[in-house]
Curated annotation (Swiss-Prot):
Name of the protein in its database record: Peroxisome biogenesis factor 10
Keyword Glycoprotein recorded: no
Gene: pex10
GO cellular component: peroxisomal membrane
Zinc finger (RING-type): 322-360
Enzyme Commission number(s) of this protein: 2.3.2.27
Topological relation to the membrane, as annotated: Multi-pass membrane protein
GO biological process per UniProt: peroxisome organization; protein import into peroxisome matrix; protein ubiquitination
Pathway(s) it belongs to: Protein modification; protein ubiquitination
SMART domains found in the cross-reference section: RING
InterPro entries: PEX2/10 (IPR025654), Pex_N (IPR006845), Znf_RING (IPR001841), Znf_RING/FYVE/PHD (IPR013083), Znf_RING_CS (IPR017907)
Catalytic activity line of the entry: S-ubiquitinyl-[E2 ubiquitin-conjugating enzyme]-L-cysteine + [acceptor protein]-L-lysine = [E2 ubiquitin-conjugating enzyme]-L-cysteine + N(6)-ubiquitinyl-[acceptor protein]-L-lysine
């Protein structure tokens, strides 16, 4: 019976399920272990990848930020001004300085009289330029030309605003030094006639300096080169600026040609002197010839002064021209408004239109007054 029961129990389905359930659960657990390990490894790998990516992203972002910072820093430093803007600024300043010089000259003429101020035109010009300089550069502001072109003076290589000693130095080299040199050169040439060659060297040196400016655009004037002051832009310049290299090259060619012609003429003159000295044979006669040459140079300087006086007379003749015929006035006639014309010109004008040609004041032939011994 027991055997039968055991057999029956063994073949009973519920018993089989109960007996197999523990083994089945353990098998399921064992079978489920490898997948969990694989999933954990995959998760760990994914976490490591995320960490690596998160570590790389800040580095890339930092590099991009550094590049942007470098670009921004490069934009913080303004660029140097170019030749066209510097020339335009200088021309604008010269225009306003000329107007101011004329006004100062008229004011001084009324105060001191025309005879006194005509002999001191250079001093009146220096006074006007000094006032213009004190009202602009000396107080640290821009000149009218610099404002027009958005330029600013700075110390080269430091990008700092010029200090008061730098401005005083610029004023001395720009205004006082040329005035003192111009006043002292005639006396220097009288004492040392051999230094007369400086009068021809200085203009060539100035043209050479101008050629260098056309090449590199650094210093337009000697005063700014000696005081180490340059111009920068107040605005951002995106477009390319034109260059004046061709003008600099042409100036250098002109300087070389003029120097060659000058040396050629002097060498020919020296050869003639040597030949004349060989024929004479005495050293004392050579010294006399040299003294004669020095006297000739002094006479040339006197002739040059006379030529300057003639030029001044020509300017006065230009002021005495009639505004209608543009020639020197003949039989000078004054109108009621005070303008001067030729008698023939103003009478013909009054026959057509009874108005002054200059100010349109009503006039007639009866009111025109001829000026005798004028």
């Amino acid at each position: 019976m027991s055997n039968v029961q055991s057999q029956s129990n063994s073949h009973h389905p519920v018993h089989n399920i109960v007996n197999r359930s523990p083994t089945s659960r353990s098998e399921q657990q064992i079978r489920s272990i490898p997948p969990t390990n694989n999933n954990n490894n995959n998760n760990n790998n994914s976490i490591n990848n995320i960490n690596n990516n998160t570590q790389r992203q800040p580095l890339n972002n930092n590099n991009n930020n550094n590049n942007n910072i470098n670009r921004n820093n490069s934009n913080l430093y303004p660029s140097y001004a170019d030749q066209p803007d510097i020339l335009r600024s200088s021309q604008k300043d010269e225009y306003y300085k000329k107007l101011f010089e004329d006004q100062c000259f008229e004011m001084l003429t009324r105060i001191t009289g025309p005879r006194f101020i005509m002999n001191r035109q250079s001093e009146s010009k220096l006074l006007a330029n000094t006032i213009y300089y004190l009202l602009t550069t000396m107080i640290g502001s821009q000149t009218l030309g610099e404002e027009y072109c958005n330029l600013r003076k700075i110390k080269d290589k430091t990008f700092s605003i010029p200090s008061i000693p730098d401005r005083i130095k610029l004023y001395f080299f720009h205004l006082l030094a040329p005035y003192l040199i111009k006043k002292s050169l005639p006396k220097l040439f009288q004492r040392h006639p051999k230094l007369y060659i400086l009068k021809e060297i200085f203009p060539k040196f100035e043209r050479l300096h101008l050629a260098l400016f056309y090449f590199n655009g650094s210093y337009f004037e000697f005063s700014k080169r000696l005081s180490d002051i340059r111009y920068i832009f107040n605005r951002k310049i995106d477009q390319k600026r034109p260059k004046y290299d061709i003008l600099g090259l042409l100036i250098i060619i002109q300087i070389l040609l003029s120097t060659f012609m000058y040396l050629k003429e002097n060498s020919f003159f020296l050869k003639q002197q040597q030949k004349d000295g060989g024929c004479n044979g005495d050293g004392e006669e050579d010294n006399q010839d040299l003294n004669k040459d020095i006297k000739i140079e002094q006479v040339d300087s006197v002739i040059n002064n006379n030529n300057q006086d003639q030029n001044n007379n020509q300017e006065e003749e230009e002021e005495q021209k009639c505004t209608l015929c543009l020639e020197v006035r003949t039989h000078t006639t004054a109108t009621i408004c005070g303008h001067l014309f030729c008698w023939h010109c103003i009478t013909e004008w009054c026959n057509n239109k009874e108005q002054c040609p200059v100010c349109r004041c009503p006039i007639s032939i009866r009111t025109c007054v001829p000026l005798y011994n004028y």
